[in-house]
Amino acid sequence: MRPIWSPIWSEGSRRVSLSRRSTVVSEVVPVISDPCRIHVIGVGGAGMSAIAEVLASMGHTVTGSDLKASAGLDRLSALGVDVTVGHDARNVAGADLVTRSTAVPDRNPEYMAAAESGVPVVSRAGILAAICAERDAIAVAGTHGKTTTTSMLALVLREAGLKPSFIIGGDVNEIGTGAAWDTGRLFVVEADESDGSFLLLPRRYGVVTNLEPDHLEHHGGFGELRNAFLRFVSETDGPVLVGVDDEGGRALAAEADTLSIGADPCSDWQIQNLEESWEGVRFSLRGPDGGTLPVELPQPGAHNARNAAVAAAVGVMAGADPEAVSQALARFGGVARRFEQRGRTAGVVFVDDYAHLPTEVAATIRAAGSGTWNRLVAVFQPHRYSRTQKLWRGFSGAFDGADILYVTDVYPAGERPRTGVSGRLIVDAVRDAHPDQDIRYVVRREELVVQLADELEAGDLCLTMGAGDLTSVPDEVRALLEAGDRG
């Protein structure tokens, strides 16, 4: 099939060059073109284990350590990475380079040993920047949809035969991993704006899915966050595609030199004729020359349509055959914790989602509402005290469409409690806006599981949402329901 558009991003684009010291933060970014010995402190987390996997695939000798055993360590060990449970200064012996998770403190014995012996130590962002410098990186940034969009794009490029490398914040179901190092020129990476380190990544191409207030505890305010994204756009070597279906994205695209994508007819890439159902979405994507690409996605929600549109546009611009793009998206099975169907027990369907910001929650509720359920029972766990303190009022209308809402206490994510900040803030916000809303505040996890098992009925959808540890609740509730059936 003849491509609908000629690629805007040419096959012969140059590789990104990178100075050894970033102009964004005062951190030396190593050059890792030649094989060396790299030790990873805190290798068990999803982000660092993905990096370790890629480093090993690049030909480096990789070792790593973490405080406790995990499935992630087992996977790395199977890939040939020498992993150790526990931190010990001896683990860094012989290392040419050390990198550490953001959760690893300066008092860590391995970090201290490396620093004292003169072995270079870089952050997660620093080692990720070094990896990006080895390929033409496509950095996917934005407030919402980064992981899903990055996953879709990796699948699209892979199915089109472009053999991309990638590091994603979750495992892609069709690929079975969230990290790979292949022989193609493209490297797809999820760019995290939470601490500003996304500006450290050298990138040939950029994506901003959308822009809303988040991570203000680091940036200080939305104006500062917006300025960081303006830098992200201006410091990207090649084209940047920006979603313009939200106010922040529209303002960014209007001020910066970008390509735009969205439902707006003035967008360079326009989403047309969107149809939604519980089974998924379908739409047409009009390109800059007026040609259209049909897209069907087996994931519900207008937000997923926007994610798919971005992946399709970037895929075509990167040289993927449009027909291969459509075929890849038509079989996209999702990412862990992104509207992930967790099974059916006693006639109740369970879905788990990572949504933790007001607009994400609202979009997930809307997507769930497209099904034919007797009731939509939503369960929400607020994430971080700092985020809850700043955003709790924004949740007042986020749960519209839920028949019953359970709210738990805040998942701290390493933060210390703050006076007056708890899940009750969100409960109060919802009750003030919707006095008739059936909302229940349950602090203790064990009580939540029991209450859900007692409340749920055949024909209900149980939707758990949050970025913390609520993800295991569906399994716990299902176990109780199954025990009840057997009894």
Give residue spans per PLM region.
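Acidic, Mg2+-coordinating active-site environments of NTP-dependent enzymes
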Residues: 73-75, 91-100, 105-123, 128-135, ...
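Hydrophobic anchor at the beta1->P-loop junction of P-loop NTPases
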Residues: 40, 138-140
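Short secondary-structure boundary segments
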Residues: 102, 168-169, 244, 409-410, ...
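Conserved motor-coupling elements within RecA-like helicase/translocase cores
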Residues: 181-183
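Switch II (G3) loop of P-loop NTPases
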Residues: 186-194, 350-355
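Conserved RecA-like helicase motor-core motifs
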Residues: 63-64, 162-168
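ATP-dependent carboxylate-amine ligase
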Residues: 5-81, 94, 98, 116-119, ...
